[in-house]
Amino acid sequence: NLTEKVDIKALLNRDVRPVLIIGFVLAAFQQWCGINIVFNYAEEVFASAGFGISSSLFNIVITGTVNMVFTFIAIRTVDGWGRRKLMLSGSLGLAFTYTLLGIIYYTTSGGYVVLTVIVIAIAIYAMSLAPITWVILSEIFPNRIRGVAMAAATSVLWIASTLLVLLFPFIKKAVDISGAFWIYAAICILGFLFIRSRLPETKGKSLEEVEKKLLRK
């Protein structure tokens, strides 16, 4: 209809390109930070650490519970701590835990040390990139393109998720699971640098203030 045509035309305007880039990169980064590998390939990840099937299933329950609990904590802290700070700390925290996981997998079989570090990584993700990305996406797009821009960013997120899941077996085969976690650590560092340089704090800002700040970039 006419409204959708107007929205799409506004989306293609060069003036909104900077904010679209930020939104699309954050959407892709939420997936390519790598934590969904733990969820989608949990049994394989834990098997590589020496756990049997029954232990792996128990570990999956633990990681799922941690994810839920810390997501609720994030909902209560997002306005106090700020979106940008949570995204930056989450990116660095994941980079550190992935680097540590890579070292553990490379040097030992892992065992419960792997489970502990993975639980920490999930807690970090659940308090930062998982929920806060959606909060930011809802705040950074100008009103005139918000609907179609959110739809486009969501599409980018799911495409990134699909690619992440499809490519992991090939990455693991090429560089082993330790190398895979080091690759995700590097992606998290790149995400941290992007957020630090391109994303302003949106907490307590009106939509108009956020738009002015982002469209100047």
Task: Give, region by region, the residue ranges found by the protein language model.
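Alpha-helical transmembrane bundle of multi-pass membrane proteins
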Residues: L2-K217
